[in-house]
């Protein structure tokens, strides 16, 4: 989930309800500043795609507005930003670099997974085949970014609920691949990826990107 102006909202993942829940969040944001900021790549994927539907699909837009009975129909006006996009585009990685008090000073691999990058047209987050935004953040925080082939492949996602063995194979393959390219640590922007990749047999630590921010900016222990 996520908060907007102190109000707890949820992306509501089930297929039938996720669009209506996301539309309500988008409409709320429209009337309270016009931007919706997400921390979770799964939430971001759902909300960004629903927003695209509300802009471009007359049928979806009409049905959603009729059901929600908004005072003013919602048509995709809200700008949806992932927190990392906000750091890059609104704060600036150069500005963040100037605030670093404890450079990370280690080799870190970015793990994008699926949901931040695909479908690329709707997400428009970064190049789906060769993303760089998280590597740029790592560098700004004083770390050495490590690129490796499996950084934008699937971690196993919700398969872990029914087939832990298959997810374990994905986890170990990704960790082994990252380690073979020199990564000492992995960083992700997806809670599910974090869950699936932790405790790998390769001993490659996996953290959320906010943990690196807190460490580099000197607020980790506060």
Task: State the predicted function of each range.
Residues 1-222:
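Iron-sulfur cluster-binding electron-transfer modules in prokaryotic oxidoreductases
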